From Swiss-Prot:
Gene from which the chain derives: ruvC
UniProt family annotation: Belongs to the RuvC family.
Protein name: Crossover junction endodeoxyribonuclease RuvC
GO biological process: DNA recombination; DNA repair
Catalytic reaction equation(s): Endonucleolytic cleavage at a junction such as a reciprocal single-stranded crossover between two homologous DNA duplexes (Holliday junction)
Function of the molecule: The RuvA-RuvB-RuvC complex processes Holliday junction (HJ) DNA during genetic recombination and DNA repair. Endonuclease that resolves HJ intermediates. Cleaves cruciform DNA by making single-stranded nicks across the HJ at symmetrical positions within the homologous arms, yielding a 5'-phosphate and a 3'-hydroxyl group; requires a central core of homology in the junction. The consensus cleavage sequence is 5'-(A/T)TT(C/G)-3'. Cleavage occurs on the 3'-side of the TT dinucleotide at the point of strand exchange.
Cellular compartments per GO CC: cytoplasm; Holliday junction resolvase complex
Length: 161
């Protein structure tokens, strides 16, 4: 199973691809899609959609996992993040891929074993679990964590059904 994890954002959208073979998780690729902060929101969303569509076409994942929105203090930021999430989900659905969503607490629990883990702990565990030489760029590391969460949760759902 090849999983595309996405950490959506209107400024930077991180992506991470992993391959689950048996009980092993293998790193395939990771990166970030950057948008121009001075560009209109619609143009930024198109940049995100086009970038994720290219990643999907290049790597042919079998599923997509997206970080679910959190409750934000700034309503405008939350709305913009919601737009980025929608575009990320649309890229997956338009490629006929199943799309799953996970909260930050679920991701941290799956990766570190503690739902309130600090970001550096999550980044370090992603590095260890995927045998990376160094910690990935922050948004890409978050996306890899979402993909790892999906790999673990998908396996658990398989066992339960």
């Amino acid at each position: 199973m090849r999983i595309l994890g996405i950490d959506p954002g209107t400024r930077i959208t991180g992506y991470g691809l992993i391959e689950k073979i048996g009980n092993r998780l293998l790193h395939v690729d990771n990166g970030a899609i950057y948008t121009r902060t001075d560009a209109p929101l619609a143009d930024r969303l198109k940049t995100i959609y086009d970038g994720l569509s290219r990643v999907i076409a290049d790597y042919a994942p079998t599923g997509v996992a997206v970080e679910r929105i959190f409750v934000a203090k700034n309503a405008l930021s939350a709305l913009k993040l919601g737009h980025a999430r929608g575009v990320a989900m649309l890229a997956g659905v338009n490629a006929s891929l199943p799309v799953a969503e996970y909260t930050a607490v679920e991701v941290k629990q799956a990766v570190v074993g503690y739902g309130r883990a600090a970001k550096p702990q999550v980044q370090q565990m992603v590095r260890v679990l995927l045998n990376l030489p160094e910690i990935a760029q922050e948004d890409a590391s978050d996306a890899l964590a979402v993909a790892i969460c999906h790999a673990h949760c998908f396996h658990l759902n398989d066992l339960l059904t």
